[in-house]
Amino acid sequence: MTAARLGALDPTVFELAARRVMARCDELARITSTPGAITRVHLSPEHARVNRLAAEWMREAGLQTRQDAAGNQLGLLPAADPEAPVLMLGSHLDTVVDAGRYDGIVGVLMAIEVVRLLQRRDDDTSGVDAPARSPFDFGLEVAAFSDEEGARFGKALLGSSAVAGTWDDAWWELEDPDGTTLREAALEFGLDPGRVSEAARRPSELVGYLEAHIEQGPELHARGEPLAVVSSIASARRFQLVVEGEARHAGGTPYDMRRDALLGASEAALAVERICSTQHHIIGTVGQFEAFPGAMNIVPGEARFSLDLRGEFDGERDRVWDQISRELDDIMGRRRLRWHTREVHNAPALFCAPLLQDVVGEGIRSTLVPGSAVDGSILGSGRPEDPTTLFSPAGHDGMAIGAITDVGMLFMRNPDGVSHHPDEAVSLGDVALGIRALAEAVAHLGAEHRRT
Amino acid sequence: MTAARLGALDPTVFELAARRVMARCDELARITSTPGAITRVHLSPEHARVNRLAAEWMREAGLQTRQDAAGNQLGLLPAADPEAPVLMLGSHLDTVVDAGRYDGIVGVLMAIEVVRLLQRRDDDTSGVDAPARSPFDFGLEVAAFSDEEGARFGKALLGSSAVAGTWDDAWWELEDPDGTTLREAALEFGLDPGRVSEAARRPSELVGYLEAHIEQGPELHARGEPLAVVSSIASARRFQLVVEGEARHAGGTPYDMRRDALLGASEAALAVERICSTQHHIIGTVGQFEAFPGAMNIVPGEARFSLDLRGEFDGERDRVWDQISRELDDIMGRRRLRWHTREVHNAPALFCAPLLQDVVGEGIRSTLVPGSAVDGSILGSGRPEDPTTLFSPAGHDGMAIGAITDVGMLFMRNPDGVSHHPDEAVSLGDVALGIRALAEAVAHLGAEHRRT
């Protein structure tokens, strides 16, 4: 199948595919550990349920399914040559706590639709029961990663890191909030921790990795455009910080005798905002914060908080961390507090491969030429000759997968820029455009691959 | 028994009594829900255990014991006239989380020793088995209150409020951190919530209430004095505050689109410190603080924190709360956040009764006259002619009991001013002086009472 042939398809097939994706997002949203909200973390019973459902949908789309040794759900559409490498398409099915229904999930379901649209059956000669296969020199594989958010064990990208072969056995001792280790959770899920390396793929097995994702910010909406090429994924570091002071009686301890850890941590959180907000493309967030012993009438002797620090460039991000560290020294010194930190995540910026940026751009161009768009209201509002390119401050599975293969990403417009929240949204029309653009991108890559 | 007769006792009896008190403080410290630390909250299994032990010690000292309908442990030494009112002596046996071993506890154990020292048996005529009785026109009753700290249900003074007849049935619905209501906890403890009013005492039943307590600050230590008369107990209000913003993705949400509840709450905590620290005898403390949903990669949409606000005078304290409220309006308005609060405790300042201040002062004077002190090292460092008088920024059971009777308090020196912390301390010598001063105070009151 070529890009030209895909363009000749009835545009309503993309809308039908998008309707199925939206309905399935709703169906997965009901699989949650928190009734009335969406929370689905790594190696939970909900994880097992969505994997089973995704596998069913993959098989229904003609894919050969398996769950790998890290709990990732995979679906393969092989090439004619069974030894040929694969292009991986996908995203993750886990969520943050009290999440929206599209982050990650929509990308997995769109990948299934794209593979369904692109597959070929050799039914001309051998009948309708012939297995589906990739029309390209490479196979197509849908990956539903098991952990991208890191909501349970603090460490993000566990699923894609296993695939990338960058697993660190120290992670087995990470604990969730209930004190269950990653090792215990894996065993309970039915995985063998000793075999996690079997999930790792070799670079030679892969042509690349393509992912569609909602934008987790307001940029496309502000520009009035439905789709964008992603240029790079933010570099990210995550820290757990501890401030130590002295627990004292709230009534009897005068201010000048206090060493209040909570106030030191409060100043630190505000310093992060003050320092980062004046920088370009640097974002620091304190998302967790707790004071101990946590009684109304005791001056807190300890405070713990998290810092998530992202930047477009590693060096810039590290320079800002140094600045924050110096500021913490000042604050804690002035308040006679001690502070220390543990880095729990460190991922360098991931630059999307030029070829994959090109094919995603071609996919968007092919999709948004006047007359071809599914959603008439969007027509003409895009700039097909010059697809928008965005930097992603949010992390994605590509950050891990980038260790073994080229990565490309497609962003879809997010009406309010809201993500990691129940109000997270994407329109049916934009998902239809996204499915088409991703399919076009894969077809362009197929054509490029054949030429090289 | 008169003050003069008490003064004729061998001073070593006070040291022996103090040794028993210190040993029992150590024994009670081992009854905790948190091994390695001291935590003993209202209506817990540990509460039941310390009540049983206190009752045993009370009986061993000749008292008639009972546990009242609010879980307070009481021990009575009746007067010759069984209808006579009683002077209540005591404090509380509950603790904050990760507490010291003296706050409250030492006052209960000292009261037992004082009653043991003062009691009379009519053994001259009727033999050794005659029951002990008060030598005064009033009975003596030791009260070990069940809840002063409020560590479990947020509301402090539950035990003494029941005794004061100021119980509010709305409190039954208060929840502990596990979601157990006060009603459920009472039932589980074996109490009948419908009968809590039976714990209430009438003003006519009481002569007054006297309590010995460690100072929860550094003032006596700084002055080099072992004991002080307490003039008043701080007025206190406690609030639970909620800040509401919007949970957003930590990577994708630019600073100008954020409504970060944690940063608003951090500013609020610092504002409390800034406002209160410039006032005389006003102390505000943020002891609890939590952010939600509490994930590293989500901008917090909600933050909850507590405020404990104390002052020597109610009006001054309320004026400062108004100032804090206006500051919160400013902060939250600027950050596009909402805030609301629930007041969980409001106690007016309690002024100790002039007569009880006088007898406590007499008790200290009688104790610290040169030659009578137990601990020679302290001798002469006090100023017996003019006992130190201190305001108590910390709350005490007298705040509740003050609703039905006169209150008097005696403070003992606290070497580092530390309280609500494992390092809380008081010396054996100061406890011995305290026991003597409290016994002398009761004897002086007995003499006063006879005169009137």
Where are these regions (language model features)?
Chain A
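Zn-dependent metallopeptidase/amidohydrolase metal-coordination segment
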Residues: 21-24, 29, 87-91, 376, ...
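A non-catalytic alpha/beta surface segment that caps or lines the substrate-entry region
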Residues: 33-78
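His/Asp/Glu-rich mid-to-C-terminal helical/loop segments that flank catalytic regions of hydrolases
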Residues: 231-233, 249, 253-278, 326, ...
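A short beta-alpha structural unit
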Residues: 39-43, 285-294, 306-313, 338-358
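Active-site-adjacent substrate-binding region
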Residues: 15-18, 29-30, 181-231, 269-274, ...
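Midchain, well-structured core segments that form catalytic/ion-binding scaffolds
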Residues: 135, 147-148, 152-314
